Amino acid sequence: MEVLMAERADLVFHNKAIDGTAMKRLISRLIDHFGMAYTSHILDQVKTLGFRQATLTSISLGIDDLLTTPSKGWLVQDAEQQSLILEKHHHYGNVHAVEKLRQSIEIWYATSEYLRQEMNPNFRMTDPFNPVYIMSFSGARGNASQVHQLVGMRGLMSDPQGQMIDLPIQSNLREGLSLTEYTISCYGARKGVVDTAVRTSDAGYLTRRLVEVVQHIVVRRTDCGTIRGISVSPRNGVGVTERIFIQTLIGRVLANDVYMGLRCIATRNQDIGIGLVNRFITSRAQPIYIRSPFTCRSTSWICQLCYGRSTTHGNLVELGEAVGIIAGQSIGEPGTQLTLRTFHTGGVFTGGIAEHVRAPSNGKIKFNEDLVHPTRTRHGHPAFLCHIDLHVTIESQDIIHKVNIPPKSFLLVQNDQYVESEQVIAEIRAGTSTLKERVQKHIYSDSEGEMHWSTDVYHTPEYTHGNVHLLPKTSHLWVLSGSPCRSSIVPFPLHKDQDQMNVQSLYVEERYISDLSMNNDRVRHKLFGWDQKRGRVSYYSGPDRIISNRNWDSIYPLILHENSDLLAKRRRNRFIIPFQYDQEQEKELRPPGIVIKIPIKGILRRNSILAYFDDPRYRRSSSGIAKYGTIEVDSIIKKEDLIEYRKTREFGPKYQIQIKVNRFFFIPEEVHILPRSSSIMVRNNSIIGVDTRITLNIRSQVGGLVRVEKKKKRIELKISSGDIHFPGETDNIARYSGILIPPGRVKNTESKFKNWIYVQRITPIKKKYFVSVRPVVTYEIADGINLATFFPQDLLQEKNNLQLRVVNYILYGDGKPIRGIFHTSIQLVRTCLVLNWDQDRAGSIEEEEAYTSLAEVRVNDLIRNFIRIDLVKSPISSTGKENDMAGSGLIPNNGSDRINTNPFFSKAKTQSLSQHQGTIRTLLNRNKEGQGESLMVLSSSNCSRIGPLNGSKYHNVTKESIQEDPMISIRNSLGPLGTVPNILNFSSSYHSITHNEILFNKYLLPDNSRETFLVPKSYFMDENRRIYNLDPCSNIILTPFNLNWCFLHHDYWEDTSTIISLGQFLCENICISKDGPCVKSGQIIIVHVDSLVIRLAKYHLATRGATVHGHYGEILYEGDTLVTFIYEKSRSGDITQGLPKVEQVLEVRSIDSISMNLEKRVEGWNERITGFLGIPWEFFISAQLTIVQSRISLVNKIQKVYRSQGVQIHNRHIETIVRQITSKVLVSEDGMSNVFSPRELIGLLRAERIGRALEDDICYRAILLGITRASLNTQSFISEASFQETTRVLAKAALRSRIDWLKGLKENVVLGGMIPVGTGFKGFVHHSREHNNISLEIKKKNLFDGKMRDILFYHREFCGSCIPKNFHDTSEQ
């Protein structure tokens, strides 16, 4: 006792917290020094001490103990400010989505981390005895991360795909979460709870499978006599590798003598302790060969020396020890442990932050610019990258600071920039590389439109048939707005003139800027083609009359005044835009409601309707029946007005009435169409009052008689107001049933009717009939609605052979029910303007057509719009066979003789337009003072350029006349395009009406203009501000809502005219005028003298290496993938990946890259080894090499996962398992011997022995079995049956008459025998002669094995050339 006291006095007193790792070390040192019994006694005392102290403290935890860190408020505010700036950068296209996500995550992660670091000192200063503080740093359950969620902030969470949600949870659990935060955190938290349970069971099952594989492996011999070994060499590096080197060596047995120079420092079969390892490290001995379970020659057990020391007591393992089961549990148990440890952070994300270099003081920074080159940081900021050490000087007033910036760092400031003290000037690349994985992030288009990019994208796709383009450098991708029009499946449109159609079948004509008089086959081929790629047929209207004749399917709206607001109505996809004028001019203009109809090609036949006017006097808001009364109708012309292709066909005839007495009648009634299932609260033929409830949520608007009619799928309920008469015998009102009666016609009735009435006789079932007398609304059709009030006077005069007539249409037939849709009005009469002209001569082959187009003339600063109507003759080809030709799908040969197919862009070479008569007539905007009328009529004979008009203050008009070459003409007219009258020369090659300019982008001109007939990649605009893309495979329509008008102040315009060019892209908030920045981003498509038209566009930034999907000019729909970024993401290092990863490796699933690599390696080895050794050895050696290589690779992979978690498992446990996975080979079919059948699985050692015994080649190849398969391919069928598939295994064993020698543990447990381990082991050892003669056998084999070893395993040069280094180096982790 005194001795002990004296020793204790000499001991050093350590006042330091001891954690789990330190405790492990202490216990292992105690065991080394004092042995097991004494150590357990000491540990008991430690346990007692701990429990006693814990009971004395008696900590309780209350909600008031959770104190939030005071600095949280400004930290969160600061992070939000940074996020807002980042959002703006993203919006303006300075950073792309990945950079934004990355930076956002780092901002919030840094905030969260800073809060977590603040938490500890805050508690220590304010409340050191706070229970939360004591618990969280006690090392027991609960750690800083969990406490941080209670009192700091929860931070960023993962979504179900494992991606980061860049909306952080700013609250902590003490403050409580908002609804959004709760929803975001639900997934992570639930995942934590569920995963803990699931992974625990997974780890348990993994343990079970592992034990199943190796349960029969017991130490049964002292030495198997192997001379193989695994080479381990200490690396030159220190730190990690040295630690792993020590762990690998301790407890192993040497396979060879180790020499230092000529002196032997360790002998074969000597076990290695810490002292010997240190000598190896200091002496830098050459590779040391150790024995391992891989090298053991025994088939179904293991020898003492190959296993090495036991981990429990530090001596060589005892005979009879069940090392297999220990190995299985050693690997399986940490899985359980790790699982439990992982998810208690509730799915909260963790990341890493780079180190920063800050300026020591205020001053000007200077560095050598030649040593750096510009780059982008991973957050998208501009920076300089330095490859070598960079010396930076910061000059303040009185002192010069020198800062050294390490290589591969980012410099975030420019040369000669003024920096403030503590400003971040550089970012240092993190020294340790974390686990990273490459992730793809797709960016999707959020609008419809057309893809556009600059020259920075490779226009040729990466693969020959793909549409994937690579970006060589950072650039913007633009999506130009516009609503695409999908083509129909029907190759030929079956619609007639003015039909209303669904959008799906709307055909958009492709406009070609090609000279149609050239008989070019390629032109004809392009005009009409099947678009097979998209699985639908696009219909391209060609120059042929028949095809174009069938293509009148859409009414194009006209925008007649640039500053007018557009009110667009879509009625059954017929685009009709009524005009809204400036308020002060409204009184003078024609009444609103006139709509001008121009067919899709702008071609009017005779008797075409040019405009129509809906008079508000003939408008009803209720349903009813139209009646023509007893008036004689001269002629009724029917036009089929509506065709729908949805299995039903409805015809709404248009009736053109020319009547002697211009009067018709409307019988109002209230109609409700109800579903068949609805419950009706009124009876048929009953009389109800106003506001009576009909169904649960519908009330009647009028009172009267109710008629209920039940149809197949619906119920029709009509309420007709009026009087009910039960006629007596004297009354003759019943005779007039079903007709209109004028006032005073009915006699002998009690009441006289002052207005027209409609009599209806109703006979209910089994009841007396009665008569309903209904009031009638009478409409007089005003005979001469004076259209001169709508149009200027000269428009109606017959001039130049063109006539306009006014015609009234009644839109509903006699007796037809008119159904009003809820809250919409019904137009009963439409006044139309019909265009007509005299045919030249009766039998003319050429039929005349009227071409309409729009011209714009500026008079006295008012923009005037003209409709221009030209008569053009066109050849008719075989009118009789019209339908056949259309059905055959052939374009006749004379199809390209017709010149002026396209009214908006005609290139007339054979016929000049001046041969035809034409008028340009004004339509609106008559000046208040009536000035400028002299310009109103222009014929094409005086279509030379008209200079600036009187009173016009713009003089920068382009003066050049248009050249013959269209390319030059385009460039010439691209100045400020505000040519005032904008009626250009009709030269023989180029004819333009306003807004039809071809737009060029400087990027778009191809290198070789071989396709001469097609002007390269341009846009064509018609007068409706619709833009046609000349790609034969796509249709796009721009509605006016996709355009943005930008008015420039005139004085400023002259200075900036150089900046703005047609086709240029403007980003958002770029200043182009005095009024302020341009708010929207887009492409300039029209340049006027004082205004621009910008086609709206969204732009996306893409950096180098990104993949662009789709082709240039391709139509994109919402949600299409635009671009894919590939970026590196640090992998979360927890066992989320760990446990499944371990399982994946052990089950040898091919998802992982390991099996792929192994296959490639094996092929390489086979080739090389055949060269070295010749054919006979090929199979034997390549199988051996494959097995050795894959074993080491598997061990390293499993160790990597566990080490990343700080879990240490001795290599020999993993080796024991891996040995079983790789212990089988597959017999090949070629060179097959008589012993085994092809594709049979046999043990590797057994194959070698039988091969030697028979002196015959058995060809086999290495195979990796998963742990499950290995468990089902053992020597014991009882063990297999008790694991899985019991019936199948037992049935097979019975059929094959298998014998179970009961060598393993499990089969003995199942049958209740003695287990062959521990004390029961001795009964199973049979000392055979083979065992006694081991030393002799070694001598015989030694010569050959030595040579083999030199060739295969340890020869440095050879191994270096064909085997990766980790083949002979377990130290590479």
From Swiss-Prot:
Pfam families: RNA_pol_Rpb1_4 (PF05000), RNA_pol_Rpb1_5 (PF04998). It is found in: Plastid, Chloroplast. One of its GO terms (molecular function) is zinc ion binding. One of its GO terms (cellular component) is chloroplast. InterPro entries: DNA-dir_RpoC2_beta_pp (IPR012756), RNA_pol_beta''_euk (IPR050254), RNA_pol_Rpb1_3_sf (IPR042102), RNA_pol_Rpb1_4 (IPR007083), RNA_pol_Rpb1_5 (IPR007081), Rpb1_funnel_sf (IPR038120). Zn(2+) binds at residues 224, 296, 303, 306. Its main location: plastid. Binds 1 Zn(2+) ion per subunit. Its EC number is 2.7.7.6. Keywords: Chloroplast, DNA-directed RNA polymerase, Metal-binding, Nucleotidyltransferase, Plastid, Transcription, Transferase, Zinc. Its cofactor is Zn(2+). It catalyses: RNA(n) + a ribonucleoside 5'-triphosphate = RNA(n+1) + diphosphate. One of its GO terms (biological process) is DNA-templated transcription. In plastids the minimal PEP RNA polymerase catalytic core is composed of four subunits: alpha, beta, beta', and beta''. When a (nuclear-encoded) sigma factor is associated with the core the holoenzyme is formed, which can initiate transcription. DNA-dependent RNA polymerase catalyzes the transcription of DNA into RNA using the four ribonucleoside triphosphates as substrates. Belongs to the RNA polymerase beta' chain family. RpoC2 subfamily. This is DNA-directed RNA polymerase subunit beta''.
